[in-house]
Curated annotation (Swiss-Prot):
GO terms for biological process: ribosomal small subunit assembly; translation. It is found in: Cytoplasm. Pfam families: DUF150_C (PF17384), RimP_N (PF02576). This is Ribosome maturation factor RimP. GO terms for cellular component: cytosol.
Amino acid sequence: MNLEAQISKIVEANGAALYDIETANEFDETIYRVLITKTGGVNLDLCATISNELSPFLDVHPPMNGHYRLEVSSPGIERKLSKPIHFQNAIGEKVKVKLLGGDKLKGVLKAADDKGITVETKQGEESYSYSDLGTVKTYFEW
């Protein structure tokens, strides 16, 4: 079983689901970020519990060479969409899309399947395959 599957098992044992795993460098520090979701929301106690269970596991099965800081959190209201399941769960939400060619668009995610997405923009519905997409994020108008 690979590392992501093992992490997912630990997360699911606590009633949550693994959303994504990211590695980031912030302020000369490497962060290994485990993003989780749960129906009804994610709270600090859940993040702490999962972090406390993941930490000894990752001490034995390090996710990378060198020092890192483990962070367990929700992906947030404005979150990156990268897997087909992320897009399928975000149907009806507002998204910002940056295409690989550099073009950008905003709209409402209308559909998503295993091949691509459809976004309702001011110009109408536009469909893209996943291979056309650069970065896609949900956004919230404050």
